C-alpha cells in the first residue's frame, strides 16, 4: 500500500493514510489491512485474507481522481494483479478497480447499494474467456535455464515444509 499510494498520488505514505500494508489500530488493538472496508463485499463472492476492501482509508486523491476531475466524461479503469495496485490507482472517483483472483478472473469490491453483477459488467466477457482458456490450456511453467531448476528446493520455517521452484510451478 505505501508504495502503490506514493507512486499513484505523489504523496509520502505519512500523508496518504496508508503508512504500511498492515498496522495495529491504536484504539482497538486490532490489525488493520491498508484497504480494509468492512462495509463492502468482494464481487467474486469469496473472502480473501485481506477481507472486504475499498479506497476508504486512502486520504488523498490519485491519478484516476485527477483524470476524472479534468475530464469527467472519461472512462478510467485500473487493472492490477493485486487489490492494492488497482484500488490505489482507481482512487475515489475512477470507474472501476479490478484485480486478478485465481479461479475467477478479475474481481472488484462492491459498496453498499451496488450489485456484484453491475460492478463486474465491464470485465464479464473477459472473465468468461479467461476462465475457459485457463481450463482448456492450463499454464505450464518451464525452466528457461538449468540454473533455475537447480534453485528449486525444500525448506522449513517453524515446522512448516515448503517447496520452491523458479519460476513458480
Locate the predicted segments by residue.
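Acidic helix-start/capping segments at beta-turn-to-alpha-helix junctions
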Residues: 1-6, 84
Amino acid at each position: 500500500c505505501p508504495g502503490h499510494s506514493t507512486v499513484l498520488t505523489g504523496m509520502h505514505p505519512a500523508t496518504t493514510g496508508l503508512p504500511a500494508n498492515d498496522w495495529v489500530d491504536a484504539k482497538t488493538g486490532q490489525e488493520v489491512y491498508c484497504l480494509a472496508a468492512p462495509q463492502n463485499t468482494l464481487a467474486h463472492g469469496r473472502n480473501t485474507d485481506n477481507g472486504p476492501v475499498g479506497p476508504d482509508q486512502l486520504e488523498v486523491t490519485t491519478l484516476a481522481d485527477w483524470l476524472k476531475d479534468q475530464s469527467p466524461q472519461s472512462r478510467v479503469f485500473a487493472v492490477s494483479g493485486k487489490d492494492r495496485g488497482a484500488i490505489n490507482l482507481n482512487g475515489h472517483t475512477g470507474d472501476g478497480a479490478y484485480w486478478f483472483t485465481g479461479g475467477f478472473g478479475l474481481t472488484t469490491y462492491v459498496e453498499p447499494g451496488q450489485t456484484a453483477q453491475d460492478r463486474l459488467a465491464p470485465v464479464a466477457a473477459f472473465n468468461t474467456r479467461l476462465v475457459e482458456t485457463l481450463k482448456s490450456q492450463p499454464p505450464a511453467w518451464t525452466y528457461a535455464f538449468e540454473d533455475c531448476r537447480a534453485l528449486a528446493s525444500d525448506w522449513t520455517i517453524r515446522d512448516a515444509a515448503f517447496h520452491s521452484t523458479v519460476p513458480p510451478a
